[in-house]
């Protein structure tokens, strides 16, 4: 663990009561939230330079030194490219794991359509981000404890990531007027990207980010912190080679507290790996019911959003149904004395709640 981000929710006011003398003896705790962050980038860029071999290919020391400088610069170029990829991957990761709010625009649409839709909705979000709201951070979305947090963003801290094929159809002049912000300031807060795909070190695509075409966020959503960066080198006299090692150690995380909305043509589907059942906030593996009872179904991860199928092993004893269409709240209704197992299933993952009916 590298550190933590601490957020203190705004205090809630109360109506003044001149007769409340006992209130001075109560404890009023601040609503403090904590997100733990880790160092997750530790990359080394190696390079071997054998000067005697290089000298054979050059007619002057000046050309040789210039070439060696180009070789060492390649280490930094590789590092900067990786940092660009890691930054884009933050957006892809948050979207893929359903840990960020998503604004969907129905497809199929052309880049022109996406640009128009983005401009209109981004204008609305640009204004809403500046108001105290619980709607655009991901704290509750990922199962953060306590009440939802209230956040807001200064207009100069709102940044936009946009895919190049969509950005090409966006008129920055119109956008600046719509946002009521200086064009130069807006341009400084727009970051065009080629795509939100994620690739392995071998160049294999490991995440298809074609559904994502943009993002509007508080710049503090990006938790990118340098830990250490240094160059080391050593000379190997045995083969007259100089070894260079550029080390880059950083933290690449995203904040659950900051406002952020991803624009995509569809939401990502996250499957659960486990279920648990809560009745009045307490985890249960078995319950006894005498009347219709609501049960909260909590998934691992909490942000899993795949549609859950519920079933009763004995509908003559108890039935189960999603409450008001909610995916993770069910109502178990008694039918006759006896027992039944209520199951929650997604794919091959199943959770079971044993129910005893006593009517």
Where are these regions (language model features)?
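Surface-exposed assembly/interface segments
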Residues: 1, 64-65, 359
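Assembly/oligomerization interface modules of large self-assembling protein complexes
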Residues: 1-47
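Long, contiguous amphipathic alpha-helices that act as assembly "spine/axial" helices in icosahedral shell
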Residues: 33-103, 242-247
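Residue-level signal for alpha-helical context at structural boundaries
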Residues: 89-93, 262, 313
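Extended, solvent-exposed, turn-rich assembly/linker loops in the middle of proteins
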Residues: 98-195
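Extended, compositionally biased alpha-helical segments that mediate assembly or anchoring
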Residues: 180-273
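Extracytoplasmic soluble-region selector
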Residues: 270-359
């Amino acid at each position: 663990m590298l550190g933590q981000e601490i957020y203190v929710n705004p205090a809630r006011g109360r109506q003044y009561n001149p007769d409340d003398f006992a209130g001075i003896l109560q404890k009023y705790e601040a609503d403090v939230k904590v997100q733990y962050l880790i160092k997750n980038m530790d990359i080394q860029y190696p390079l071997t330079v054998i000067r005697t071999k290089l000298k054979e290919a050059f007619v002057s020391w000046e050309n040789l030194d210039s070439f060696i400088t180009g070789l060492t610069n390649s280490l930094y170029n590789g590092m900067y490219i990786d940092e660009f990829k890691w930054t884009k991957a933050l957006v892809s990761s948050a979207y893929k794991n359903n840990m960020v709010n998503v604004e969907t625009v129905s497809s199929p649409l052309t880049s022109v359509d996406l640009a128009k839709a983005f401009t209109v909705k981004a204008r609305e979000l640009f204004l809403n981000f500046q108001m105290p709201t619980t709607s655009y951070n991901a704290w509750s979305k990922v199962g953060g404890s306590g009440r939802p947090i209230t956040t807001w963003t200064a207009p100069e801290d709102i940044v936009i990531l946009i895919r190049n094929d969509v950005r090409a159809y966006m008129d920055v002049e119109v956008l600046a007027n719509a946002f009521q912000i200086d064009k130069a300031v807006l341009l400084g807060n727009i970051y065009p990207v080629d795509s939100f795909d994620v690739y392995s070190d071998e160049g294999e695509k490991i995440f298809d980010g074609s559904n994502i075409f943009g993002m509007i966020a508080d710049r503090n959503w990006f938790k990118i912190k340098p830990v250490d960066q240094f160059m080391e080198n050593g000379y190997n006299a045995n083969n007259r080679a100089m070894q260079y090692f550029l080390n880059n150690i950083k933290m690449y995380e995203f904040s659950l507290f900051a406002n952020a909305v991803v624009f995509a043509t569809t939401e990502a589907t996250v499957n659960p790996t486990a279920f648990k059942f809560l009745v009045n906030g307490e985890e249960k593996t078995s319950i006894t019911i005498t009347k219709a009872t609501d049960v909260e179904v909590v998934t691992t991860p909490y942000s899993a959003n795949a549609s859950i199928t519920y079933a009763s092993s004995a509908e003559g004893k108890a039935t189960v149904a999603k409450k008001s269409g909610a995916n993770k709240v069910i109502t178990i209704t008694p039918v006759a004395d006896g027992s039944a197992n209520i199951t929650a299933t997604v794919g091959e993952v199943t959770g079971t709640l044993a129910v005893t009916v006593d009517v």
